[in-house]
Amino acid sequence: MKLFIAATVLTTISFAHPALSESIAHTRQLLATKQCQSCDLSGAGLVLANLSGANLTGANLSGANLSRANLSGADLTGANLVGASLFGANLTGAKLGGAQIAGADFRDAYLYNVSFGDADVNVAHLQGAIGIPIAAGKAEDFYRWGMLQGQKGDSQG
């Protein structure tokens, strides 16, 4: 029985290791070159990273922590940002067309001149975000977001 458990653990580790090392290699590549198209960066810790102008088209950033990262001018077209934390991140001028942003946390993020394209902002957390483009939603969306802010006592006046 002990042999079976040990074999199971070793098999699990050996299968998980290549994916982990690939993710680490992609993270290093991104930080060194700011080029990481279609990379697997899922779950990556990129807090406070300077990724201005980075090319992350088609990258998998699901569950990644990009809190307070500088992504100004970054190309995130078609990226998977499902469940990613971009709390307080600077996304000024970033391209997010076709990105999957369900459950992404954009609270307190800077979104000036962001191009969301056809990304559905109604499935992301935008409370406290600054500079949300008018094209990001309908009047009803902005009203709802404002009401949520008011209920939380976050209104300025």
Predicted regions and their residues:
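Tandem repeat scaffolds
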Residues: 17-157
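Bacterial N-terminal signal peptides
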Residues: 6-14
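Positively charged n-region of N-terminal signal peptides that target proteins for export
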Residues: 1-5
